[in-house]
């Protein structure tokens, strides 16, 4: 019988049995660099922690199970994972990438991968004729869904039909929804990317990245690359992510409930010109989300009427933290222009809809009313400061 996802977050069925690891309920941290060999040509299965480590291996099995993949690889950061993916390609290869991506991914593609001879077509995969951009050198399509920060939603299954028709890889960054709400491999993706720092870890206390696949040939290539480049996740960080995953479902559900309430509240404010949350029926990707995901997540973006209003909000929040990153238990508000997308050329930012009045919100698990009370206070103070009285 198939176990539920909350159970999968806690228990790895293949390792169940009485008193494994001396009966420890919490999986041990194998804080070691190397391992003793019983004799020449014999091994315990572990030789050197750059190659593999029991704590990291246990985490990888959990993540692979959650994404319904055959293998998962844990990296020191999300960007380390994406960097390694790019090692699958050679000079002259062509990739189609979503126009709206995390700024760090854009920086990698524009300033590192391009210099290594890889060519990119940057398009809106959620609305353009993707197939028309495929050429004889195209090797993969790379997307986020929802995208960061504009929350565009792409039909993964529809895109997978194109990649299968042309023998391309489909690489999907699933960070914003986590495996709790969405499983791209089941929809036809070949590789799933995660910044484990975010929802999987969930506590803003460690960095991690993951690649998950359901193809043995890809797994073999990625395993060789991670062992060769030395970008695997350390034992203690692996344990922190394991601990975070245990409460993934509880956190995702609570944060999503809060996100719905905040999105609805923002829509009532005259100073807010646009609320972008895929859980709202007016979002262009709402129906696709209902089809391919089990939830809408807790990430939202909103546009304010002016840069001055946006900066004032950022300066006045207290319980809500003005900080980069996302997916933790605390609510974080981010200014893409100077933070996550600071290295993205202004022309590209504006083309994607990111302005100096754009704010991104990662909703946490606080009591929703406390979050709303803080926003009410911050908006009122900003309106008093800018307009001399309440506006919305």
Where in the sequence are the language-model features?
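N-terminal "arm"/small-domain region of PLP-dependent enzymes with the aminotransferase-like
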Residues: 1-53, 59-62
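Glycine-rich beta-alpha junction loops
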Residues: 14-16, 31-37, 176, 198, ...
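Conserved PLP-enzyme active-site core in the AAT-like
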Residues: 17-18, 72-271, 276, 287, ...
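Conserved N-terminal alpha-helix of the aminotransferase class I/II PLP-enzyme fold
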Residues: 34-83, 87-88, 104-111
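Structural motif
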Residues: 67, 93, 270, 317-318
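PLP-dependent enzyme catalytic core of the Aspartate aminotransferase-like
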Residues: 103, 110, 119-121, 251, ...
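A common structural junction motif
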Residues: 229-230, 317-327, 378-387
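Conserved C-terminal alpha-helix-loop-beta "cap" of PLP-dependent enzymes
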Residues: 274-359, 363
């Amino acid at each position: 019988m198939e176990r539920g996802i909350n159970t999968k977050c806690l228990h790895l069925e293949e390792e169940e049995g009485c008193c494994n690891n001396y009966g420890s309920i919490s999986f041990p941290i194998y804080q070691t660099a190397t391992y003793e060999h019983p004799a020449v040509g014999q091994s315990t299965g572990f030789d050197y922690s750059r190659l593999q480590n029991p704590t990291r291996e246990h985490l990888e099995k959990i993540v692979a199970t959650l994404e319904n993949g055959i293998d998962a690889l844990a990296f020191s950061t999300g960007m380390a994972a994406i960097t390694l993916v790019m090692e699958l390609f050679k000079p002259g290869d062509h990739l189609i990438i979503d126009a709206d991506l995390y700024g760090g991914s854009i920086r990698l593609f524009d300033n590192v991968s391009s210099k290594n001879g890889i060519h990119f077509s940057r398009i809106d995969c959620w609305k353009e004729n993707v197939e028309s951009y495929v050429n004889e050198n195209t090797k993969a399509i790379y997307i986020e869904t929802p995208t960061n920060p504009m929350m565009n939603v792409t039909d993964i299954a529809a895109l997978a039909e194109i990649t299968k028709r042309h023998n391309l890889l489909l690489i999907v960054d699933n960070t914003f929804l986590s495996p709790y709400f969405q499983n791209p491999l089941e929809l036809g993706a070949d590789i799933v990317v995660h910044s484990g720092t975010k929802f999987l870890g969930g506590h803003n206390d460690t960095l991690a990245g993951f690649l998950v696949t359901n193809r043995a040939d890809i797994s073999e290539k990625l395993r060789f690359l991670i062992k060769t480049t030395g970008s695997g996740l350390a034992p203690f960080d692996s344990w922190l992510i394991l601990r975070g995953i245990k409460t993934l479902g509880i956190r995702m559900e609570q944060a999503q409930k809060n996100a719905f309430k905040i999105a609805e509240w923002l829509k009532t404010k005259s100073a807010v010109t646009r609320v972008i949350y895929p859980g709202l029926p007016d979002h262009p990707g709402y129906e696709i989300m209902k089809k391919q995901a089990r939830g809408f997540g807790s990430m939202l973006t909103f546009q304010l009427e002016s840069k001055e209003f946006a900066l004032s909000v950022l300066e006045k929040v207290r319980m809500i933290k003005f900080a980069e990153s996302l997916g933790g238990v605390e609510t974080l508000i981010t200014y893409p222009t100077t933070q996550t997308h600071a290295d993205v050329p202004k022309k590209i930012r504006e083309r994607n809809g990111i302005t100096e009045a754009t704010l991104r919100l990662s909703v946490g698990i606080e009591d929703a009313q406390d979050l709303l009370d803080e926003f009410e206070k911050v908006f009122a103070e900003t309106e008093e400061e800018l307009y001399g009285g309440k506006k919305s």
